[in-house]
Amino acid sequence: MLDHITPFFALVAFFLVLMPFAWHIKSKNVGLIMLSIWLMLGNLDNFVNSMVWWKTTADLAPAYCELSVRLRHLLFIAIPASNLAIARKLESIASTRQVRAGPGDHRRAVIIDLLICLGIPIIYTSLMIVNQSNRYGILEEAGCWPMMVFSWLWVLLVAAPVIVVSLCSAVYSALAFRWFWVRRRQFQAVLASSASTINRSHYVRLLLLTAIDMLLFFPIYVGTIAAQIKSSISIPYGSWSSVHTGFNQIPQYPASLVLMENTFQRNLILARLVCPLSAYIFFAMFGLGLEVRQGYKEAFHRALLFCRLRKEPKASALQHVVADIEVVTFRSHDTFDANTSTKSEKSDIDMRGSEAA
């Protein structure tokens, strides 16, 4: 019906984002960590939905669908919000404001990043019920899908927040690029003075990531909902009861019905491809660095040791000799006698005195 390769792309994308996740945690970049989490959850949900509802529209997992539709709705703004946090971090470093920041300022910056990456998506998802006409719908091969009523309130609570967050991210990205370009010759010194774990190469990759979000994914999102915004802005909301009539009914849409709606089919495919495509770009930028590759080697080595496919390397003879020398040296210091040393020095002085006489 739609496509048979998206679920497999999503599964591969999940593992590609998972592989360097430990390294991202060490970097302590809240925006990058949260973006990794959202991409992993989005791709895993995409794969599970496609597999469970591959050839059916039956309501097989109501509890899972309740969570899935909220996750899908949350991802509309969670990914742009994470990019906004990354762009703010880059602008703060390049503008040298982070140089003048104290420990309290760093703690405050982490809290603000968490509010952006986690708080905004939670509030955005909690308001989903206002425009939600049914608990969820089921699309063959796509799985659980949010069901919304389009009106001016949908534009205000669903479409507008994503556009505002994306525009803020674009502004910070532009400012970060401006500062980077102005201070490009001494930028390594700027990074060193900011006490940041980001090096120049990593900074450029983060800047490219925010630029791709601004130049690629934001236009795709606006392009897919522009017509809907134009048609919905003048539609009245009605009332709560009219919007939620038959809320517990679960609409089911077979593949043949979806294929009849060309616009909906196109938007559906784009919506399903955003997470896998974002994950592949993310991995290409942050999953192939030297430090990350070294982490892969260490993890692979530990896995071989755990499965007993490789033996623990034995210490060389040279290491044992060095260790023995260190032990002997340490013991010789322990047996040092201050009294003996003093007496010997005194006898030497007496002998010299007698010779002089």
From Swiss-Prot:
Q: Which residues cross the membrane?
A: 5-25, 32-52, 67-90, 110-130, 145-165, 206-226, 268-288
Q: State where the protein is found.
A: Membrane
Compositionally biased residues, Basic and acidic residues:
343-357
**Taxonomic superkingdom:** Eukaryota
- InterPro entries in the cross-refs: GPCR_Pheromne_A_rcpt, GPCR_STE3
The reply on keyword Membrane is yes
Function statement: Receptor for the A2 pheromone, a prenylated mating factor.
What is the protein's name according to its record?
Pheromone receptor 1
